[in-house]
């Protein structure tokens, strides 16, 4: 069953993606049509308080003009032929964002239009990527010296106009990037990142004017001496060519990397002859033996295979962490090789550097420039690293960035502060800290600063690493990187801070949101519910319950066993089952409703997530979320190195790379009738009711009949409305019902159940439920943070982390140079509102590990009127509350007495004692806090009924046809005369008027008369035939058509009895009114009773009435 097509644009199917994928404008409203009612074009007078919507990166140096310009009816995107594709793309995009029909055109622009202009004479001013915007009486002008410059200008136009404001202030700006390279590392190394994800990632980069992506990945090896390396993950040449083509269209340079001579396990695991052996003879598949000419040749062959696929002028060889976890002392053969190759006194570092230089020479012969990570630069005796190699600096050990500047190397800033990792919690880009602490492109790892204007500093990038990859799905990564991507965009293009704080920038980037490609991507193309999936019969006959997950996948539950489908067993890379031919299995169902912060269940949870994609002929593909291979019914003919040792039996379901399967990887999903519910916010308090969306789905092959959705809430909760009735839902469609729910007195966990019943009979058809958590308090605004100390050297753990609403970050007391001792405290200003009091303090310990959580704590509260800031408070008085916390990472709450001051207050949370590294060990002297907050009593609001959708699909009953009449020019008394070769148009009218008006037409003799589906009659040959119109339920009416030759005078249209002389009856006046040439099957004119008799004979005398339904 396909997902209901009436979903609102930009809403990502599942509640948590709606509520959260979330941040970052993922759910920004589709249209902005209500934002402006002004006429399109320029106005000399701007509306009062009109401001220019923000863009990311910012357009600094804006010069205000006079007046304003409005996008509206009649606005076009006008360009030359050379920019026609850009114009069409922008027009389509703005149409969807604004609900204004915008066309692309070539020719001259008017003041209503957006014009795109390519002006090569602006190259000196704008460079290769810059653009100029002019907003005024000539419309909105986008000018670039290059195609990409114009394209980047359209990105800013789109961002401004997608935020709900269609009137822009007049003005002008010219902007170009501060740095040449602005982008990201995307490591599809060992595990696969889907091509869908890469496609969306490129769209996001383009929207942010980012132009560089380093892609560490495997192009499927196909040479005789490399094809044993075709283990998963890999990409085919067609895969790569498609996303490289898109990247080039966006001005993005995609640079491939095969890391060497370290991190080579996915290339060398089946080639032991190329692996480096240690002094004991043990080989390591991660290490290429650079002393072996055949191993070096193998690497160069891999480089050759990438020829003709990528368009970049660069090659990246990695060159990092060759000896990670060991040292050259364990590989004495490299010392011997170095001395032989590079002379007396040479070291393994010389051999390592010589290998890099050799690869540099090899790729230069191909017209490419080499790039490496900075830990490829080591101290040497006899060999110097070539100066034309670009150094991407990520790691502070070894040679310092300033030394490399002095030596004249070209540098890119790839600091670890801009890293994400699926498993390593320390690698989470903290955009707020970086922005607020004035990080810039000259700030290298460890805070080492070089001149940000160094002429060989190419720019900076973020890096997205997999590591132990089961901790996050790629969709969770997509959500996580939103802020950091926008931060690096701002820092590398504009190198400025036009927002006073990160919170100000964050508000704008959330309002701008994602570009169109990401908003339009359908993560869950079928509704949650029960489905028959016959192709899975080798696992279970089902049926299967599909449950949507917060990150846009499905959990697939076998309703027979109660267990869930998982891809859990098989050989792995980075802790993910990458084995080609691995078989899915049924396991106990994990809770997939939780997010990535629940790390202890990540492996069970994420191996039960499946990506379903719509494919051809109404069928679907199914992929494990972590592996991105395809489930398929094995044929026994698949070819892959993994299948040489483990091959699934033909007819069983297993995972295979997409290029190894075809129609055997297509699945039929036949839906049962069902119901599901999602909630906007699971946390509810009397001041903040939550909206529940109930979706009722019809089976794929049957309408539902009229149904009613009725909620049942526990005591202490209220819900409106009391029920929602839905008209019969057409087969394969879904309808929506909305409910608002709030807790009045209830607290803690609660379940709201929904019953689906047949409206007429009351028969129960199904149930569903949502889980909520009720609180009678709410978080209050916190500001003006302070702490007794904070650690920013050993790790980045400032006090602001305890108030950033992110459980994955934390504040830590200072523990380096020197460490601070107990007691430790954090303080902040709490603002519950005038006349209100804070009621409690909540504390959450760091979530990555338990290494000494708070044990004995005290809370102090003073009126904010007593001091100008937290730092100015000199007398905190006595604690208003104390508590003993258990040894746990769970949220702890401390109730406060009613004697504290009302209104704004300063709060100090003091940790006097801490637990040890274990529950029984001695207490530690440090402290850490993930989240600290004050709560206040929630003031109840009146619960209202939500407006119900007006576009739910429904089956409408139409009256049965009771009769039909046929009319047309020349028709009289049910008869029509035509000359051979002529035509006539007949019309059928079904009674009653609101019955189905569709009829079928037929001729009793096609050799005499033919009739088409519209009722058009053609006279073919001399003779008589009947033309009949028949309704869907069998009612019919006919016209007798007589065809004559051209010279003939038409005779009677039906048989007549000869009359005897003197026996003719006088003509009498009809007792009923003639039917004006129309013949009715229900009350015919007495003059045509003979024809009526003939009609009934044709109709067969027995008509079965069928109720006609239509879907609207």
From Swiss-Prot:
It holds the Pfam family Glyco_hydro_20b. Its EC number is 3.2.1.140. Keywords: Cell membrane, Disulfide bond, Glycosidase, Hydrolase, Membrane, Signal, Transmembrane, Transmembrane helix. Disulfide bonds join 187-189, 564-589. Residues 938-969, 1044-1081 are annotated as: Disordered. Changing residue 263 to F: Does not affect the affinity for LNB-beta-pNP, but shows a reduced kcat value. It is a single-pass membrane protein. Residues 1-34 form the signal peptide. Residues 975-1041 form the BIG2 domain. The active site is at 321 (proton donor/acceptor). It is found in: Cell membrane. One of its GO terms (cellular component) is plasma membrane. PANTHER family: BETA-N-ACETYLHEXOSAMINIDASE, PUTATIVE (AFU_ORTHOLOGUE AFUA_2G00640)-RELATED. Present in the infant gut, this enzyme is involved in the assimilation of type-1 human milk oligosaccharides (HMOs). It hydrolyzes via a retaining mechanism the beta-D-GlcNAc-(1->3)-beta-D-Gal linkage in lacto-N-tetraose (LNT or beta-D-Gal-(1->3)-beta-D-GlcNAc-(1->3)-beta-D-Gal-(1->4)-D-Glc), an abundant HMO unique to human breast milk, releasing lacto-N-biose (LNB or beta-D-Gal-(1->3)-D-GlcNAc) and lactose. Is a key enzymatic factor for growth and proliferation of B.bifidum in the gut ecosystem of breast-fed infants. HMOs function as prebiotics, promoting the growth of bifidobacteria in the gastrointestinal tracts of breast-fed infants, which in turn promotes optimal health. Belongs to the glycosyl hydrolase 20 family. This is Lacto-N-biosidase. It comes from Bifidobacterium bifidum (strain DSM 20082 / JCM 1254 / BCRC 11844 / KCTC 3440 / E319f (Variant a)). The gene is lnbB.
């Amino acid at each position: 069953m396909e997902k209901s097509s009436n979903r609102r644009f930009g809403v990502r199917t599942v509640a948590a993606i709606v509520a959260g994928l979330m941040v970052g404008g993922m759910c920004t409203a589709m249209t902005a049509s209500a934002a402006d009612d002004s006429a399109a074009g320029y106005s000399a007078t701007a509306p009062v308080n009109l401001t220019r919507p923000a863009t990311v990166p910012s357009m600094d140096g804006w010069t205000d003009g006079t007046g304003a310009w409005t996008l509206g009816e009649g606005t076009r995107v006008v360009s030359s032929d050379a920019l026609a594709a850009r114009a069409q793309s922008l027009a389509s995009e703005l149409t969807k964002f604004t609900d204004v029909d915008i066309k692309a055109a070539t020719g001259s622009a008017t003041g209503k239009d957006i014009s795109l202009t390519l002006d090569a004479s602006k190259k000196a001013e704008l460079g290769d990527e810059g653009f100029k915007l002019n907003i005024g009486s000539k419309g909105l002008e986008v000018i670039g010296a290059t195609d990409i410059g114009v394209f980047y200008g359209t990105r800013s136009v789109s961002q401004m106009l997608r935020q709900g404001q269609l009137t822009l202030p007049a003005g002008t700006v010219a902007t170009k990037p501060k740095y040449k390279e602005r982008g990201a590392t995307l490591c599809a190394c060992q595990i696969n990142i889907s091509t869908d994800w890469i496609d969306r990632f490129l769209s996001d980069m383009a929207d942010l004017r980012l132009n560089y992506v380093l892609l560490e990945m495997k192009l499927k090896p196909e040479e005789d001496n490399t094809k044993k390396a075709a283990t998963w993950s890999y990409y085919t040449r067609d895969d790569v060519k498609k996303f490289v083509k898109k990247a080039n269209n966006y001005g993005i340079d995609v640079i491939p990397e095969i890391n060497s001579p370290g991190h080579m396990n996915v290339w060398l695991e089946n080639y032991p002859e190329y692996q480096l052996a240690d002094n004991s003879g043990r080989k390591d598949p991660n290490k290429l033996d650079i002393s072996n000419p055949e191993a070096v040749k193998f690497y160069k062959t891999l480089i050759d295979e990438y020829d003709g696929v990528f368009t970049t002028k660069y090659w990246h060889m990695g060159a990092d962490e060759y000896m990670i976890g060991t040292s050259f002392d364990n590989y004495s053969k490299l010392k011997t090789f170095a001395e032989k190759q590079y002379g007396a006194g040479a070291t393994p570092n010389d051999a390592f550097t010589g290998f890099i230089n050799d690869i540099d020479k090899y790729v230069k012969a191909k017209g490419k420039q080499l790039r490496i990570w900075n830990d490829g630069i080591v101290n040497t005796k006899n060999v110097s690293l070539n100066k034309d190699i670009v150094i991407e600096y990520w790691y502070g050990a070894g040679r310092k960035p300033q030394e490399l500047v002095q030596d004249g190397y070209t540098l890119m800033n790839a600091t670890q502060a801009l890293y994400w990792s699926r498993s390593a919690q320390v690698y989470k880009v903290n955009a707020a800290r970086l922005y607020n602490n004035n990080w810039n492109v000259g700030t290298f790892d460890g805070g080492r600063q070089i001149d940000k204007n160094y002429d060989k500093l190419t720019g900076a990038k973020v890096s997205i690493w997999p590591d132990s990859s089961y901790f996050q799905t790629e969709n969770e990564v997509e959500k996580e990187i939103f802020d950091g991507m926008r931060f690096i965009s701002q820092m590398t293009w504009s190198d400025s801070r036009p927002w006073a704080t990160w919170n100000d920038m964050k508000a704008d980037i959330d309002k701008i949101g994602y570009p169109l490609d990401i908003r339009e991507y359908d993560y869950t193309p079928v509704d949650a519910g029960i489905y028959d999936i016959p192709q899975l019969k080798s696992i279970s006959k089902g049926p299967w319950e599909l449950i949507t997950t917060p990150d846009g996948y499905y959990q697939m539950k076998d309703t027979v066993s109660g267990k869930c489908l998982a891809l859990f067993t098989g050989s792995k890379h980075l802790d993910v089952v990458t084995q080609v031919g691995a078989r899915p299995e049924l396991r106990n169902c994990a809770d997939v409703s939780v997010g990535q912060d629940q790390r202890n269940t990540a492996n069970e949870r994420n191996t039960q997530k499946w990506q379903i994609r719509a494919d051809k002929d109404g069928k679907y593909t199914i992929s494990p979320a972590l592996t991105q291979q395809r489930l398929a019914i094995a044929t026994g003919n698949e070819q892959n190195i993994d299948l040489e040792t483990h091959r699934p039996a033909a007819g069983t379901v297993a995972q295979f790379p997409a290029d190894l399967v075809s129609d055997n990887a297509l699945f039929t999903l036949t839906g049962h009738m069902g119901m599901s519910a999602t909630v906007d916010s699971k946390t509810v308090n009397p001041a903040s009711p939550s909206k529940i969306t109930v979706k009722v789905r019809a089976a794929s092959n049957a309408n539902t009949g009229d149904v009613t959705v009725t909620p049942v809430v526990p005591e202490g909760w209220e819900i409106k409305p009391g029920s929602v009735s839905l008209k019969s839902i057409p087969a394969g469609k879904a309808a929506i019902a909305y409910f608002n729910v709030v807790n009045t007195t209830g607290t803690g966990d609660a379940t709201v159940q929904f019953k689906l019943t047949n409206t007429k009979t009351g028969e129960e058809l199904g149930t569903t439920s949502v889980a909520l958590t009720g609180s009678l308090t709410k978080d209050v605004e916190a500001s003006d943070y302070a702490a007794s100390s904070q650690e920013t050297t050993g790790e980045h753990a400032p006090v602001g982390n305890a108030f950033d609403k992110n459980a994955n970050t934390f504040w830590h007391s200072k523990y380096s140079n020197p460490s601070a001792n107990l007691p430790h405290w954090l303080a902040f200003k709490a603002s519950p509102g005038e006349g209100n009091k804070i009621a409690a303090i909540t504390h959450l310990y760091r979530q990555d590990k338990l290494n000494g959580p708070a044990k004995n704590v005290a809370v102090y509260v003073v009126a904010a009127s007593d001091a100008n800031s937290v730092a100015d408070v000199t007398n905190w008085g006595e604690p208003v509350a104390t508590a003993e916390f258990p040894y746990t990472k769970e949220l702890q709450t401390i109730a406060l007495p009613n004697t504290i001051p009302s209104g704004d207050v300063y709060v100090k949370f003091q940790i006097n004692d801490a637990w040890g590294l274990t529950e029984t060990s001695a207490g530690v002297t440090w402290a850490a806090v993930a989240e600290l907050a004050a709560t206040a009593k929630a003031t109840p609001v009146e619960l209202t009924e939500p407006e119900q959708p007006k576009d739910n699909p429904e089956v409408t009953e139409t009256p049965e046809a009771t009769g039909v009449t046929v009319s047309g020019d020349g028709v009289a008394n049910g008869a029509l005369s035509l000359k051979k070769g002529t035509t006539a148009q007949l019309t059928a009218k079904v009674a009653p008027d609101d019955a189905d008006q569709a009829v079928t037409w037929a001729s009793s003799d096609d050799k005499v008369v033919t009739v088409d589906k519209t009722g058009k009659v053609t006279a073919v040959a001399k003779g008589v035939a009947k033309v009949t119109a028949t309704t869907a339920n069998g009612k019919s009416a006919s016209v007798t058509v007589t065809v004559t030759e051209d010279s003939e005078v038409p005779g009677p249209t039906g048989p007549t009895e000869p009359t005897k002389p003197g026996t003719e009856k006088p003509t009498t006046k009809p007792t009923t009114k003639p039917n004006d040439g129309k013949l009715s099957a229900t009350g015919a004119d007495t003059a045509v009773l003979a024809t009526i008799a003939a009609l009934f004979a044709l109709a067969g005398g027995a008509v079965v009435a069928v109720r006609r339904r239509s879907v609207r």
